């Protein structure tokens, strides 16, 4: 039987302060049962599989290993803020957000790779936090009592408990939340915590679904009450142009803080999920739908072709020479992952893949020993020259250890691991287990071990996606079991086909979850083919970008890497200067791009996002535009399209966005 799916409704399950004792936290554990939403929470459409259920394979495993061998695996050796003197390890050093940020990405990476060395690094942060709670219930270093860094640490502790079953976590969180509920009336949320309240509500809901303690819903309501009204702000969205430093400073007193924080890029990336998260407590359909309006407004006024919105440090318009902060990339991804689970909407997964396969790797070096603070879709130079940032400094698009500011140095590590842990989800319904099943929400080589209808299930996914459109899955239940398997059909994938054991199913509709319900037996094979057709999208001044599947394509400008300084180990800071012209306009029919573009594919290697061997290349006709030049290390605003040029026609080679570090992604279009 084959049909298109609908959303499911979940059921809470009991929670107790039980789990593995301290010291039983290493080695593989059988996947825990899926935890659904407990009444009276409004159910999510899908549920996250317990951490440890998904394992990377193929190129994704290699990418995570590159990360582990890069800065993530050695950060404490080269950066004192998360080194042995960190306040979150009992030292006298940095005691605010950086230790929790680092742990939030290090933990899932360590366990995805089953890497004993990385686990040991993470365990030190966890143990210190669990063993040094304050007598009143507060956690963390005594240097400050700011709510915000605790919000981040709670996210890390929930992951750790799922991965290890450590019996210390739930009582510590319970004591902390009871303390906070009593304290918030005297010491309300402020600054970052006020604007990022939804991240704590996630942890509150996580604990409620395991314990059923009613006070937790009172705490969630208080956090919402004291937090910034993001939904209301977007209902009357005022920030429709590039924010200037002068504009932010126009406000006095408290207005200054709120205006600056409401236009702050990372805050907006985290806020994307506030409607769906709060809808679980409020039960409001309108709250749940708010995510779509927020994304629409950000894309309309600040959208960029790599899937991001501009923010350098604040919202900065649609010019592709504006930047997007790396913290915003990974927080936007996390918001999409959470919003996708709650809403079950395919479009959120489409955008998630666009960020994961373009913006995330596009701002990291191939070996992941260096990153940028800001990346640009039209990035013609990475240097100390003045850039068109709103408030960020001149090092913001350099590649290095701590360009501009250290928040991204601590925070970017969560991007790949959390994406890997979101590839597969679980469906379920409150009334019975008829809808219990597995959901493929994003695609990458992976395998999943879980239980469906009390039957152990192993699914293997083999693919070179996003560089190819074919995906092969092998379903291996321990015994035959009937359940629905949902497969996401991206919105761009018209003409997709699905075969089960060689038999072609009814053609699925793009932008839906295809639902296959059958009795699955060991060795059942699924073949999915997504046509990877070329398509175009329109951006600033009617410029044009080219996409294929989830990948965005760019012209890779010649690069001259000049070392600015050496740090420790393999860490260095780099400027990158152009060695080839970049001011091209494309000559193609935007309505039928395949008629004017030649596509070639090569083998997907161990570094698929590396510059040396892009797995896909496009060849397209172009001409230089003499008046379009650069100034102070940035491309001037794109000329209005269509445009004419008398210069000689050339053939440009375009490659996946992430394989370039100097690039043009939004092109003027030549007049036909």
Functional labels for PLM-detected ranges:
Residues 26-29, 291, 350-358, 363-474, ...:
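C-terminal beta-rich recognition modules with glycine/proline-rich loops and embedded aromatic residues
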Residues 88-92, 100, 105, 109-249:
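Extended ligand-binding groove/face enriched in aromatic
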């Amino acid at each position: 039987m084959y049909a298109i799916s609908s959303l499911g409704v979940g059921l809470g399950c009991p929670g107790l302060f039980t789990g593995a004792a301290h010291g039983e936290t290493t080695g593989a554990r059988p996947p825990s049962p899926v935890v659904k939403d407990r009444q009276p929470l409004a159910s999510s459409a899908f549920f996250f599989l317990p951490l440890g259920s998904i394992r990377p394979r193929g190129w994704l495993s290699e990418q995570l290993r590159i990360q582990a061998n890069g800065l993530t695996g050695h950060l404490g050796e080269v950066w004192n803020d998360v080194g042995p003197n960190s306040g979150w390890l009992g030292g006298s050093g940095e005691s605010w957000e950086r230790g929790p940020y680092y742990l939030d990405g290090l933990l899932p990476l360590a366990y995805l790779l089953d890497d004993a060395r990385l686990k040991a690094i993470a365990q030190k942060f966890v143990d210190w936090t669990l063993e040094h709670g304050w007598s009143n219930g507060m956690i963390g270093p005594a240097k400050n009592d700011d709510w915000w860094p605790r919000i981040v640490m709670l996210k890390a502790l929930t992951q750790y408990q799922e991965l290890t079953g450590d019996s210390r976590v739930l009582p510590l969180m319970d004591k902390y939340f009871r303390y906070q509920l009593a304290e918030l009336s005297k010491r309300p949320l402020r600054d970052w915590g006020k604007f990022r309240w939804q991240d704590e509500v996630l942890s509150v809901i996580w604990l409620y679904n395991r314990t059923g303690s009613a006070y937790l819903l009172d705490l969630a309501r208080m956090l919402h009450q004291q937090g910034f009204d993001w939904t209301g702000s977007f209902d009357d969205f005022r920030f429709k142009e590039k924010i200037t430093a002068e504009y932010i400073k126009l406000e006095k007193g408290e207005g200054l803080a709120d205006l600056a924080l409401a236009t702050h890029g990372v805050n907006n990336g985290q806020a994307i999920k506030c409607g769906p998260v709060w809808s679980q407590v409020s039960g409001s359909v309108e709250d749940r739908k708010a995510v779509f309006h927020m994304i629409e407004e950000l894309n309309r006024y600040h959208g960029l072709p790599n899937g991001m919105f501009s923010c350098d440090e604040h919202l900065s318009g649609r010019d592709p020479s504006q930047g997007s902060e790396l913290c915003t990339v990974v927080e936007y991804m996390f918001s999409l992952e959470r919003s996708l689970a709650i809403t079950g909407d395919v479009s959120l997964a489409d955008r998630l893949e666009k960020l994961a396969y373009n913006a995330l790797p596009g701002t990291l070096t191939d070996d992941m020993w260096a990153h940028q603070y800001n990346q640009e879709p039209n990035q013609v130079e990475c240097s100390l020259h003045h850039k068109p940032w709103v408030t960020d400094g001149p090092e913001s698009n350099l590649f290095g250890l701590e360009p501009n500011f250290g928040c991204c140095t601590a925070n970017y590590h969560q991007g790949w691991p959390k994406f890997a842990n979101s590839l597969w989800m679980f469906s379920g319904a409150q009334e019975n287990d008829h809808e219990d099943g597995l959901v493929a929400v994003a695609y990458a080589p992976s395998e999943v071990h879980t239980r469906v209808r009390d039957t152990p299930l192993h699914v293997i996914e083999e693919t070179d996606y996003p560089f190819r459109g074919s995906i092969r899955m092998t379903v291996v239940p321990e015994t035959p079991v009937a359940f629905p398997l949902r497969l996401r059909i991206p919105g761009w994938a018209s003409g997709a086909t699905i075969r089960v054991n060689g038999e072609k199913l009814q053609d699925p509709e793009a932008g839906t979850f295809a639902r296959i319900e059958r009795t699955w037996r060991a060795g059942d094979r699924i073949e999915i083919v997504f046509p990877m057709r070329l398509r175009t999208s329109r951006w600033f001044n009617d410029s044009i970008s080219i996409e294929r599947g989830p990948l965005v394509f760019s012209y890779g400008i010649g690069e001259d890497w000049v070392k600015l300084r050496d740090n420790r180990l393999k860490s260095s800071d780099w400027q990158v200067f152009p060695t080839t012209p970049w001011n091209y306009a494309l000559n193609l029919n935007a309505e039928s791009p395949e008629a004017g573009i030649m596509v070639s594919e090569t083998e997907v290697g161990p570094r698929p996002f590396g510059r040396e061997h892009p797995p896909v290349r496009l060849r397209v006709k172009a001409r230089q535009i003499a008046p379009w030049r650069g100034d102070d290390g940035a491309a001037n605003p794109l000329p209005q399209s269509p445009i004419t040029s008398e210069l000689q026609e050339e053939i440009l080679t375009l490659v996946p966005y992430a394989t370039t570090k100097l690039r043009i992604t939004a092109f003027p279009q030549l007049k036909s």
